[in-house]
A protein has these predicted regions:
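Nucleotidyltransferase catalytic core that binds NTPs
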Residues: 1-158
Length: 158
């Protein structure tokens, strides 16, 4: 059985994230989406809220589980029998950082990292961009699923 791990902060989850998640779910028997709790990073939504949003918008994927974690990614992966870590790439600029992380993770655990380029229509999209648009009352409905857009609107009061 193959098991993939897709880690991220998902603050908030975007259609770009869902693109990578859904495509990964077609390739692996099981997929774990791990929402990172990073105390050094300021987030709009708590780890619990981000986990709830992801679970809601991925409920249609029967081979997927959403979880939260903090600590070393490879320890989490090894504890769960992960076959591969999957990372979405939007642009070459993402690759430079992700390659270093993939090499470190492999050295620490022997777990491979697979890079999945986003579909071109989402290559511009990032959670930080979505947060910025939402913060100023812009329409994010083409960037995030409806339940996420509603939570952003409630959070920023616009």
């Amino acid at each position: 059985m193959t098991r993939a791990l897709i880690p991220g902060s998902f603050d908030p989850v975007t259609f770009g994230h869902l693109d990578v998640i859904e495509r990964t779910a077609r390739l692996f028997d099981e997929v774990l989406v791990a929402v990172v709790e990073n105390p050094h990073k300021s987030t709009v939504f708590t780890v619990v809220e981000r986990t709830e949003m992801l679970a809601e918008v991925t409920a249609h994927l029967p081979n997927l589980k959403v979880d939260e974690f903090d600590g070393l990614l490879v320890d989490y992966a090894l504890d769960r029998g992960v076959t591969a870590i999957v990372k979405g790439l939007r642009a070459v600029s993402d690759f430079e950082y992700e390659l270093q992380m993939a090499q470190l993770n492999y050295r620490l655990s022997g777990i491979e990292t697979l890079f999945m380029p986003t579909t071109p229509e989402y290559s511009f999209l990032s959670s930080s961009l979505v947060r910025e648009v939402a913060r100023f009352g812009g329409d994010v409905s083409s960037m995030v699923p409806t339940p996420v857009a509603a939570r952003l609107q409630a959070r920023f009061g616009r």
